[in-house]
Structure formats: C-alpha cells, structure tokens
C-alpha cells in the first residue's frame, strides 16, 4: 500500500521530481556554462517559429494604445491606489528600472526583452512594488495581445506617463521582442544576499561588467554608499554607475532631476511589516510580492524602499520645481518612518508646501534623498544643476534626449526602430551608418571581385581574420558592432591589439585598392563599399580553404553594407567593444580571474551562437590558420589553409598526451604517447573541446569518418551567420 502523503514517483513526500537537488554544475562549478548558448529556445516560446513581431506591431493601433494608457494613468484602483490620483510616476519608475539594468561593458541588461517580468529582476529590492505596475498594465496587454510586447508596452507606458503630466518626450520606437524565460547569461554579481557589495575592491573599484553598487539595485543606494548619508561620496557612485550605462554628467543630472520631478517614494512604516518578494511569495498571491501588514498595506500605508520622500509641490506635473526646492533650502539629515536616511529643510522651513499623496487635508515639508543632494554638493554636478535651474528649457530638452537614450540604448541601430514616433534625428550613440546610395553588386560582379581578391597576394588567414575581426564585434545583447559600417578601419578598432594593427593596415590597403579600382570602372551605377568587400574577402577565403580541403561549397554573401565615417563613430563608446579575449582567434589579452574557456562561451553567447556553431567555428578557424599573431596553438593540421576536420581528429586522438607548459597555465603541449615526440601545442580554449563532455560529444560528430562534409557545410553556415549578424535589413525582408 502507498500512503497518500508519499510521492508515487520517488516514494518520499519531501522529494521533488524536477530541478531540485545538486545539479552537475553544483558538483563541478568550474565547467563552462553551456546552457547560456541554448537559452530562449523555441521550445520555451509560446508564439511559435512563424511569429514575426515586427509585422504584428505594424498592425497595432498605436494611437488607441496610447489613449488607453493615458486613461489608465488617472484610473486609480482600490487594490493599489494611485499616489496623488495618478499612476504616471509609478510607470516612469517601471520603465526606468526596465531599461536601467543596461550596462555598456557587455551590452547586457536593458529593456529589450521584457526581463523585468522574470527573476531575479522581478524580485530585486530596487523593483519593490513594480509587480503592481505590470498588473495595472495587464488589461491593456490583454486587449492588444501579440501586437505589442511586454517589453515595448512597459517603455511606452513610461513615455505616456511623462506626456500625461505635461512633458514633451523625444520619441518612441517599438521593436523589442519578448523572451519567455529568465536570462541565464547575465552576471549580476557574486553576492548571495540582497544588497551585498562584494563587487568592490581596493579604493571602491567596481567589478566589471557590473553597473550597480549593490546586489539587487539598479544603480546606487539612495541613502548613500552602503547606506551612509554622504552626498559627496554618493556622487562618486552615481558618476561611475551612470557612466557604465553610457550616460555623461549632463545626462545623469537631467535624468535624476527629470525623474524626481514626479511622484514619491514609500516608507510609511518599518520594513518588518513587508512580506516576501514575488518569487518567494505564497502561491495564493499569484505572483505579487511585498505584501504589507502595515495599516492597509497600500496607499498612504505603502512601504517600498523605506524612504518617504516627495520631491516637489507638483508631483504629477512637469516643472523645474526639483531644482527650485533643491537650491532654496539648507538641508538636515533625518529618518523616514521606516528608519531610512533622508533629508529635510533645516529649522522646519518649507513646512506645508508639499501635498500628501492620499489625503488632501494633509501637507508636508519637502524631502530629498542623499543622492539628490549630490547634484548640489558635487562641484561638477552643481554647476550643471544650476545651469538647468536657470535654463528650464534646456533641462527639458536634455531630459527628453537622455530619457530616449535610457529607454532605447539596447535596441541597436535605427533600422530596428518601429512605429510612428521614431525621431528623425540620427544620434551618435545609435552608431549611425549611411543609407545605401548606389546600385548593389550582383552575382557577376561578386564573382569578379572574389577573383581579384584571391589574386591579390593576401593569404587565406589574412582574408578570414580581417572579416572575422570586422563582424565579430557584434553583440546580440545590445545589437551593437558588426561588419556594417566598416568601422574596423576607424579609431578605435583599427588600433586594437587583437586586430594586429600592422597586419590590418596591409590587408585594408589592398582591399581599398580593389574597391577604388572597381568603383571607377563599374557601370550601371554599381559600387562596392569597403564594408561589403571586407566580408566578401572573408567569404572568398573560406571558399578557397574549402576547395583546398576538397569540399565544394557555396559561401553566402549579400551586399548592402555601407561605410561609416569617423565623425559618425564615438571613439569612447566603441572602446567597450574591444575584445579582452577572443577564443575564436585564440587571443587572450592577459590573465583573468575567469578561465579562457568561460570567456570563449561568453563571446559565443554575445554572437548568438549555439554550442555546435561555436564548436565548428573553432575547428574551422584553427585549420585555416586564422589565429592571433599567426600562432600555431590549436592549428592541429599539417595542411593549414585547408578546411578539414583535422582539428577534431587530432584533438580526440588517444595517441596524444597533453601536459601544461611550464610557466604558462593556459598553454599545453601534446606529445606522442609512446615516443614522447612533441606534436602540437594548444590553449585551454582548444583543449576544452576534448575535455568537456558536451563539447567533446559535438567534436566527435565532426571527427567521425562520415563527419567531414557535415563539418564543412556547418562551418560555412556558422560563418555566414556571423557575417550577417548586424544585417537587420535582411532579417526584416
């Protein structure tokens, strides 16, 4: 007999049948996390493989959505009443926090896929009560369904919120495609407690690529560094975290002042009254968290950050009152009812000038956050703040532009923008590329140019490496980089160590000569951009290598790229794209705390590659000889320049014994197991394809007797994918 309380599967009432217990990654945490290369699988997507969000968005009645959002702003709900009778400030915070996770160093985070709906973001302390904002939006999302993504709706709600309170926004672009599970590739920090700050070392040096001061915060601690109410010290944190989100000092001041022109924070009582976050809340709460037992738990009794601050006398109307109040008073430290540090005017000044959010008969004194006072007491911020105070029109313009940048920074080029409110002005941070202004080359010209390239004296590795260097800057995280624009010939890319500047100049000079000669003599208005020619040269090199290896392949090439200018290229903005490691070229700039194989997986994930695509590209690039500095590490072949499966057959050969090279833990020597005769050298990136069980399984496919043709075809397909990663025009077609 089986007791009703006993699980019929495991025989134990306390056991779980899925996902519990020690995973293999718990047992062996140093193995590379290959799951990031298969996240967001079609199997997790309820929309199906044929769903085209861009086409659905074009069917959207955009004006109707905005009208519904505008009506929602003042339709206060009993279950979560609107502060001051207006939900605008709540939706501004929701949109800000959706976009504000973006960081420049790896392009991850941001609003681009609606990740605020999922853990960990949906349960971050800094996102307290934003679950209510999304539930308020659900009737509108339900009404318009697949025609607008959650990712777009959250940002649009923030825009409409601003407009409904009298602010003129810079514009809005749709095109953010929802994902359906949490991101696994984003490193949010190593801390295992909320608000932990192990991310700092030395003199408050923030760990890369993080852009927030503590675990679970979007940017900074509003009470000050580690809760210490020091406005000047807080300014240092503000400057660093906002810079890591691509904001300069002026944009930072505009965003803080503009955002804090509206609404309030919530700290009506002690945090001990607040229940668990959404992911830890009981099932009957249906995904809502932070249930409070303080009074009614809502409205005037709401507890959020623990701070109880209302910045201006007009919290639902755009004004310059934030700066007026900031500079009109001398401030003294106080505490909120929840015990959080905040500031109020000295000697009771300003009493009765600020409305209460839920009781029209009550009036309050102005209050400010420690980080608000940073705008007055940091000398650089103070100068900017006073300028905006004296020039409110310039504040409005700066805030509009900074808000647009904040909410669109991770969308990539303007070609991805959708909708009737896309601004006409091209902005430098959008990495602009000129529109095609000539007739594109066709099959005949492509064949002619391939012959010219292959007869130019450039080697196969030089052709392949240059194209790879150009295209592989692409980041699927924020859709930046790629071959379009030919920015590899411009600063800063032309000087990056990984691109071997001297070798690059030689290759580009030859290709530019071919380009100029062709463009002078071609008929019918046909021209070729250098961006196209660089990719075509790489494709020609792959084709030649395949031929040398005995394979007949067609390497896809589609023209349509254009050449950007140096004036269209923000050197500082592009500097963050410089690879510190590129395992595909066997390049490692220096020793890092993270292993070379983990850095390879990270690079592959940014290139949107699967584990098989990563594997086949490594194997092909090695035998072609496309390695940094012409190093022979990983070139496991006696026929370099020929596309063969030699990398895999030799790596998996049990006749080879590998040992680390003395003094270099990242390099290994492979010797004949019987004679001890040296055969090959390889890096950790090379050897992981024989050491890791999953990667070895893939490598075995390509090393098999019947695997060489599949290897050649798969390599060409993966190569073509990387060359076209930034061709959003092709994806739309």
UniProtKB/Swiss-Prot annotation:
Enzyme Commission designation: 1.11.1.21
Keywords: Heme, Hydrogen peroxide, Iron, Metal-binding, Oxidoreductase, Peroxidase
A Gene Ontology BP annotation from the UniProt entry: hydrogen peroxide catabolic process
Catalytic machinery residues: 97
Cofactor: heme b
Site positions (Transition state stabilizer): 93
Cross-link named Tryptophyl-tyrosyl-methioninium (Trp-Tyr) (with M-245), sites: 96-219
One Pfam family, short name: peroxidase
InterPro entries linked: Catalase_peroxidase, Haem_peroxidase, Haem_peroxidase_sf, Peroxidases_AS, Peroxidases_heam-ligand_BS
Domain of life of the native organism: Archaea
Segments for region (Disordered): 1-24
Cofactor note: Binds 1 heme b (iron(II)-protoporphyrin IX) group per dimer.
Gene Ontology cellular component annotations, sorted alphabetically: cytosol
Catalyzed reaction equations: H2O2 + AH2 = A + 2 H2O; 2 H2O2 = O2 + 2 H2O
Residues that, per the record, bind heme b: 260
Covalent link Tryptophyl-tyrosyl-methioninium (Tyr-Met) (with W-96), residues: 219-245
Biological function: Bifunctional enzyme with both catalase and broad-spectrum peroxidase activity.
Quaternary structure annotation from Swiss-Prot or TrEMBL: Homodimer or homotetramer.
Annotated family: Belongs to the peroxidase family. Peroxidase/catalase subfamily.
Protein name: Catalase-peroxidase
Organism expressing this protein natively: Methanoregula boonei (strain DSM 21154 / JCM 14090 / 6A8)
Gene transcribed to yield this protein: katG
């Amino acid at each position: 007999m089986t007791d009703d309380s006993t699980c019929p599967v495991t025989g134990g009432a306390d056991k779980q049948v899925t996902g519990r217990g020690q995973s293999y990654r718990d047992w062996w945490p140093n193995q590379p996390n290959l799951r990031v290369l298969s996240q967001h699988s079609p199997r997790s997507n309820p929309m199906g493989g044929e769903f085209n969000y861009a086409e659905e968005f074009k069917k959207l009645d955009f004006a109707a959505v905005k009208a519904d959002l505008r009506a929602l702003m003042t339709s206060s709900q009993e279950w979560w009443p609107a502060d001051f009778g207006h939900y605008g400030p709540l939706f501004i915070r929701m949109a800000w926090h959706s976009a504000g996770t973006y960081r420049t160093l790896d392009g991850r985070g941001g609003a681009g896929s609606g990740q605020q709906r999922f853990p960990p973001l949906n349960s971050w302390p800094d996102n307290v009560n934003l679950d209510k904002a999304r539930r308020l939006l659900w009737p509108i999302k339900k009404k318009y369904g697949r025609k607008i993504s959650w990712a777009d709706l959250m940002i649009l709600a923030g825009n409409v919120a601003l407009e409904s309170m009298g602010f003129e926004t810079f514009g809005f672009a749709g095109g953010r495609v929802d994902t359906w599970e949490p991101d696994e590739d984003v490193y949010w920090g190593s801390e295992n407690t909320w608000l932990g700050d192990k991310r700092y070392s030395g003199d408050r040096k923030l760990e890369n690529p993080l852009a927030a001061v503590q675990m679970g915060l979007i940017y900074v601690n509003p009470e000050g560094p580690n809760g210490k109410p020091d406005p000047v010290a807080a300014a240092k944190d503000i400057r660093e975290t906002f810079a890591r989100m691509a904001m300069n000092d002026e944009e930072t001041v505009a965003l803080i002042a503009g955002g804090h022109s509206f609404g309030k924070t919530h700290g009506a009582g002690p945090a001990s009254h607040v229940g668990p976050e959404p992911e830890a809340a009981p099932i009957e709460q249906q995904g809502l968290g932070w249930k409070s037992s303080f009074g009614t738990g809502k409205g005037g009794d709401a507890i959020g950050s623990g701070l109880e601050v209302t910045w201006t006398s007009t919290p639902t109307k755009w004004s310059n009152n934030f700066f007026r109040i900031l500079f009109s008073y001398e401030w003294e430290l106080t505490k909120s009812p929840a015990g959080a540090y905040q500031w109020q005017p000295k000697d009771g000044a300003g009493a009765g000038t600020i409305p209460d959010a839920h009781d029209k008969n009550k009036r309050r004194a102005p209050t400010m956050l420690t980080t608000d006072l940073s705008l007055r007491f940091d000398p650089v911020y103070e100068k900017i703040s006073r300028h905006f105070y004296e020039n409110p029109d310039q504040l409005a313009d700066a805030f509009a532009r900074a808000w647009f940048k904040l909410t669109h920074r991770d969308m990539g080029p303007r070609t991805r923008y959708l909708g009737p409110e896309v601004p006409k002005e091209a902005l430098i941070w959008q990495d602009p590329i000129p529109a095609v202004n000539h007739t594109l080359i066709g099959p005949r010209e492509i064949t002619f140019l391939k012959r010219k390239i292959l007869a130019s004296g450039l080697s196969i590795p030089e052709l392949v490496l240059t194209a790879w260097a150009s295209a592989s800057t692409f980041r699927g995280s924020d859709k930046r980089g790629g071959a379009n624009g030919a920015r590899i010939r411009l600063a800063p890319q032309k000087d990056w160590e990984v691109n071997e500047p001297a070798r690059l100049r030689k290759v580009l000079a030859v290709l530019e000569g071919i380009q100029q000669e062709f463009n002078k003599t071609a008929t019918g208005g046909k021209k070729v951009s250098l961006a196209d020619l660089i990719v075509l040269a790489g494709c020609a090199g792959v084709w030649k290598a395949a031929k040398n290896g005995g394979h007949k392949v067609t390497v896809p090439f589609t023209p349509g790229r254009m050449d950007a200018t140096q004036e269209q290229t923000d050197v500082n903005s592009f500097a963050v794209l410089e690879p510190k490691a590129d395992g595909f070229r066997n390049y490692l700039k220096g020793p890092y705390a993270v292993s070379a194989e983990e850095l390879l997986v990270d690079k592959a994930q940014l290139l949107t590659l699967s584990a098989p695509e990563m594997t086949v590209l490594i194997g092909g690039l090695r035998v072609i000889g496309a390695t940094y500095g012409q190093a022979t590490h990983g070139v496991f072949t006696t026929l370099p320049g020929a596309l063969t499966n030699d990398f895999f057959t030799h790596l998996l050969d049990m006749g080879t014994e590998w040992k680390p090279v003395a003094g270099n833990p990242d390099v290994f020597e492979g010797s004949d197991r019987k004679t001890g005769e040296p055969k090959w050298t390889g890096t950790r990136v090379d050897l992981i394809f024989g050491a890791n069980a999953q990667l070895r399984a893939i490598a075995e496919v390509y090393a098999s007797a019947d695997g060489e043709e599949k290897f050649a075809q798969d390599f060409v397909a993966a190569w073509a994918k990387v060359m076209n990663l930034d061709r959003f025009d092709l994806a739309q077609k």
